[in-house]
């Protein structure tokens, strides 16, 4: 299933990120460069798993004939805008706050789509079981994904706290990827 694929991809990337983080701290402890956040690795993981989570919404609705391909592409596109703008802001390739705002606007669009837009309208025409699954995933995308902008803030500004950022991102990933 898509949920198992999301969990498997996350497990693989977290195994790799753990090694990166451990090696970075060992280098710092030995007098080398300061340990940094595995930002690129984290965004690679998200660029795979987040669109898969969005696809799961579509597949649940498509399985009962209640979704259009256009709905999938709108959700997929919004998820990419959200992630790419977040990466550009966090990596310093773009201005931090405007990139956060663009990413949040894309996330808000996804939230709108699943609570009031075509995705919601499609879900309303399905069975009670499908409605239940859809609502559970909608809550995860709304509440669970709200953790990420908080983490983003921890890594920005003149005194970023990368340890707190990574702890918060790890908690968010565990909550969101296992609950999904």
Name the predicted role of every residue range.
Residues 150-175:
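Extracellular/periplasmic helix-loop-helix junctions in multi-pass membrane proteins
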Residues 8-41, 84-93:
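Helix-loop junctions on the outward
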Residues 1-16, 144-154:
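Hydrophobic alpha-helical transmembrane segments of multi-pass membrane proteins
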Residues 1, 61-70, 92, 120-132:
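Membrane-interface helix-boundary motifs at transmembrane edges
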Residues 56-59, 84-85, 106-128, 136, ...:
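Alpha-helical transmembrane segments in multipass membrane proteins, preferentially the mid-helix core
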């Amino acid at each position: 299933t898509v949920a198992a694929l999301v969990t498997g991809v996350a497990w693989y990337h977290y195994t790799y990120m753990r090694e990166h983080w451990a090696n970075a701290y060992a280098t710092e402890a030995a007098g080398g460069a300061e340990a940094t956040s595995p930002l690129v690795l984290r965004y690679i993981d998200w660029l795979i798993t987040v669109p898969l989570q969005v696809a799961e919404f579509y597949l649940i609705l498509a399985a009962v004939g209640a979704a259009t391909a256009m709905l999938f592409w709108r959700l997929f596109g919004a998820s990419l805008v959200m992630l790419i703008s977040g990466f550009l802001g966090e990596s310093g390739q773009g201005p931090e706050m405007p990139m956060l705002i663009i990413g949040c606007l894309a996330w808000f669009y996804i939230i709108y789509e699943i609570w009031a837009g075509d995705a919601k309208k499609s879900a309303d025409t399905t069975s009670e079981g499908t409605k239940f699954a859809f609502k559970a995933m909608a809550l995860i995308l709304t509440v669970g994904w709200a953790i990420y902008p908080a983490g983003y803030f921890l890594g920005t500004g003149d005194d970023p706290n990368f340890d707190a950022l990574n702890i918060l991102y790890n908690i968010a990933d565990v909550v969101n990827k296992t609950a999904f």
